[in-house]
Regions:
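A short beta-loop-alpha structural element at the N-terminal edge
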Residues: 15-27
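Conserved GNAT-fold acetyl-CoA-binding loop/helix
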Residues: 28-53
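A short helix-loop-beta-strand connector motif used in the catalytic cores of GNAT acetyltransferases and
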Residues: 53-66
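Conserved beta-strand in the GNAT
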Residues: 66, 72-80
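A short, internal acetyl-CoA/4′-phosphopantetheine-binding micro-motif in the GNAT/acyltransferase core
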Residues: 96-103
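Conserved acyl-CoA
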Residues: 99, 110-126, 148
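Conserved acetyl-CoA-binding loop-helix of GNAT-fold acetyltransferases
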Residues: 104-117, 140, 144
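C-terminal "cap" of GNAT-fold acetyltransferases
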Residues: 125-162
Length: 162
């Protein structure tokens, strides 16, 4: 991942930085927290070891940003590159979560700014993600930052037991 200066907000004790291997346990906990919020508490099968290998091994396939305060990870954004035959290189925001007790403090905005900066630095043509139609707080956040939300495309998926 390209070097990113730690982004500290004036007067805040928390800051956003690139994720590290040692953050994976806390990131996993946030992934589970998000799954519970999204009404899929048993859907997470990825392990801390998977995150460590897939994000920090010799063939890392994702980039990670974390929000930290006093050594505790309180938010995260996980992204990876994808390719659009219409647009070319894109960045996909897979998970974006701030722990429930810390929402509304600007942490999400700072995490999203880090993701946006990464997208710009890589020269991608689009940053995209999904949001559940009932997740009104997230939809409001995305609309506030000027994102285009598409209600027309349906998601397809086939799951494999590995």
């Amino acid at each position: 991942m390209e070097a990113l200066q730690e982004k500290r907000s004036t007067g805040q004790r928390w800051f956003v930085r690139p994720g590290r291997r040692e953050d994976c346990a806390a990131v996993h906990a946030l992934i589970v927290e998000l799954a519970v919020y999204e009404r899929e508490p048993d859907a997470v099968v990825v392990t801390v070891a998977d995150l460590e290998a897939d994000g920090f091994g010799p063939n890392a396939i994702f980039d990670l940003f974390v929000a930290e305060e006093a050594g505790e990870v309180i938010g995260m954004a996980l992204v990876y590159e994808k390719y659009s035959t219409w647009k070319g290189r894109c960045l996909y925001l897979e998970d974006f979560v701030v722990t429930a007790s810390r929402r509304g403090e600007g942490i999400g905005q700072t995490l999203f700014t880090a993701v946006h900066s990464l997208a710009v630095s890589r020269g991608v043509r689009r940053l995209e993600w999904q949001v559940l139609e009932w997740n009104k707080p997230a939809i409001a956040f995305y609309r506030k930052i000027g994102a285009e939300l598409d209600g027309e495309w349906l998601n397809g998926r086939i799951a494999f037991d590995v």
